């Protein structure tokens, strides 16, 4: 069941961001970020609905209802999507940046982006996956943790929109670095404070800081690779970020089992966050030609 859910999600999120990056040039950042905000909006709206549905009708009827709703809501929008942009038009609007201008091969740059995506999402997974359990461990109860998770996702929407606007002015890599540094600061704050009010505030800040990180990889790929390759390359990098989320959630759980505390798990997330920031700094320090006027 979860395999089919994953396959279905992969057929929408990555291709949608790749398609949006092809249609927009001047406002590409905000366009991609708006498209990427859908899953965060769902993360805010669905949990209370699902909680009520499962309490009243059980999980089977809830899953069936969600499936029917998704099918009925998604199919009409798929029909309404515009056709893919002609390759010729995309090539004319392509950036003068390329992996070769960085002094590395395209495949080497892809590996670096995948490692960066994996590292940032290992760090990102610690609060997102374990905040509910963390609140239970502190004695606040899982309900408080669920509220903090909703706050993360809610402020993540603002983060994605803001990061998109920033990317249109600064570029994908600088915006990614800003998000990575701020995410590291939020993780560090989790180490310093564990009061209930503090956790609410830090969780909101974490969502506000990290929400725009993942869409920036789509922007960076579009900036440095040929439009003909954008779909497959964005898909590969997003796969690395999702693997990082899975690895980070599992790794944090293992660390908690061995240490009996989430403190070491937060430290582990900080280390992975530094790896991400180092790669992005390297990317920014490489000499690149000026962008052609769009």
Describe the function of each predicted region.
Residues 182-194:
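C-terminal ends and interior cores of transmembrane alpha-helices
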Residues 43, 224-261, 269:
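A late C-terminal transmembrane helix in Major Facilitator Superfamily
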Residues 1-11, 118, 198-211:
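Hydrophobic core of transmembrane alpha-helices in multi-pass small-molecule transporters
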């Amino acid at each position: 069941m979860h395999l089919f859910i994953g396959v279905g999600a992969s057929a929408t999120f990555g291709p949608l961001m790749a398609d949006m990056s092809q249609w927009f040039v001047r406002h590409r950042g905000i366009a991609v970020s708006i498209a990427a905000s859908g899953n965060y909006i769902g993360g805010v709206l669905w949990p209370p609905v699902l909680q009520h549905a499962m309490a009243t009708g059980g999980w089977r009827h809830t899953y069936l209802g969600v499936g029917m709703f998704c099918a009925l809501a998604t199919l009409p929008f798929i029909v309404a999507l515009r056709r893919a942009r002609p390759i010729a038009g995309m090539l004319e609007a392509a950036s003068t940046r390329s992996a070769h201008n960085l002094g590395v091969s395209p495949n080497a740059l892809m590996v670096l982006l995948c490692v960066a995506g994996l590292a940032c999402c290992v760090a990102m997974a610690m609060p997102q996956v374990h905040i509910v359990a963390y609140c239970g461990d502190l004695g606040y109860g899982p309900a408080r943790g669920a509220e903090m998770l909703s706050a993360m996702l809610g402020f993540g929407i603002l983060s994605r929109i803001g990061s998109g606007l920033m990317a249109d002015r600064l570029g994908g890599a600088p915006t990614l670095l800003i998000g990575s540094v701020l995410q590291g600061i939020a993780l560090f704050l989790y180490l310093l404070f564990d009061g209930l009010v503090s956790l609410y505030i830090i969780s909101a800040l974490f969502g506000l800081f990290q929400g725009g990180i993942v869409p920036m990889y789509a922007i960076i790929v579009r900036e440095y690779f040929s439009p003909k390759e954008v779909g497959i390359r964005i898909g590969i990098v997003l796969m690395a970020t999702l693997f990082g989320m899975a690895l980070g959630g599992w790794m944090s759980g293992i660390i908690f089992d061995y240490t009996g505390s989430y403190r070491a798990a937060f430290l582990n997330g900080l280390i992975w966050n530094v790896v991400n920031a180092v790669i992005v700094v390297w990317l920014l320090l490489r000499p690149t030609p000026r962008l052609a006027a769009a």
